[in-house]
From Swiss-Prot:
The keyword Ligase does not apply. GO terms for biological process: regulation of translation; translation. Belongs to the universal ribosomal protein uL1 family. It comes from Helicobacter pylori (strain Shi470). Disulfide bonds: none annotated. The gene is rplA. This is Large ribosomal subunit protein uL1. Signal peptide: none annotated. Keywords: Repressor, Ribonucleoprotein, Ribosomal protein, RNA-binding, rRNA-binding, Translation regulation, tRNA-binding.
Length: 234
């Protein structure tokens, strides 16, 4: 088994020039050629940013609605009350509630991928913050998941909204599609993501903003991308 895996990886690595930083178009082409799993692998971008997340003014966090979605069916939970619950249901939310939903979460219910809440429900959401936070599910105004416009937020989530935030080491990871996507769709999704991240560059960040960038599939090696080309995307 190990020998078979090694041979598969060796074959994949042979398709990549490790000392080369690929342009977006060629990078996408190479990554698609690496698809070898028996399932539709996720395409992921990883960016190393020139920021220090220990400083609040250098925390990069946001959301982007990819033009072609992620290829994943997203289940959405909404904390709301009264008419806003009806708006959430009509928009296609999978789970809608208030205190009752918080209790279900406390009892182990986490069968959703994104949580949205109206501002007046954040006190209720806070009761399960220790559960949602570590899973990256806590609603936040910066990602548009704390809002009174519930219908739009649910629509964005269902259409392929990707929430991202820089980690402690300055890295941002985000899915931008599936290996089965046409190259053009993967490229357009990546450009939209990078454009959004570039717009969020902190004014206090010094030096090169995108230090390193890679593109990969779930089961593939990473392909180095031209960081300068990405920084020039506006």
């Amino acid at each position: 088994m190990a020998k078979k895996v090694f041979k598969r990886l060796e074959k994949l690595f042979s398709k990549i020039q490790n000392d080369k930083a690929y342009g977006v178009e060629q990078g996408v082409e190479v990554v698609k050629s690496l698809a070898s799993a028996k399932f539709d692998e996720t395409v992921e971008v990883a960016l190393r940013l020139g920021v220090d997340p220990r400083h609040a003014d250098q925390m990069v966090r946001g959301a982007v609605v990819l033009p072609h979605g992620t290829g994943k069916k997203v289940r959405v939970a909404v904390f709301a009350k009264d008419i806003k619950q009806d708006e959430a249901k009509n928009a296609g939310a999978d789970v809608v509630g208030g205190d009752d939903l918080a209790e279900e979460i406390k009892n182990g219910r986490i069968d959703f991928d994104m949580v949205i809440a109206t501002p007046d429900m954040m006190a209720v959401v806070g009761k399960v913050g220790r559960i949602l936070g570590p899973k990256g599910l806590m609603p936040n105004p910066k990602t548009g998941t704390v809002t009174m416009d519930i219908a739009k937020a649910v629509s964005n989530a269902k259409s392929g909204q990707v929430n991202f935030r820089v980690d402690k080491k300055g890295n941002v990871h985000a899915p931008i599609g599936k290996a089965s996507f046409p190259e053009e769709k993967i490229k357009e999704n990546m450009l939209e993501l990078v454009k959004t991240i570039n717009r969020l560059k902190p004014s206090s960040a010094k030096g090169k903003y995108i230090r390193n960038a890679t593109l990969s599939l779930t089961m593939s090696p990473s392909v180095n991308l031209d960081a300068q080309e990405l920084m020039d995307i506006k």
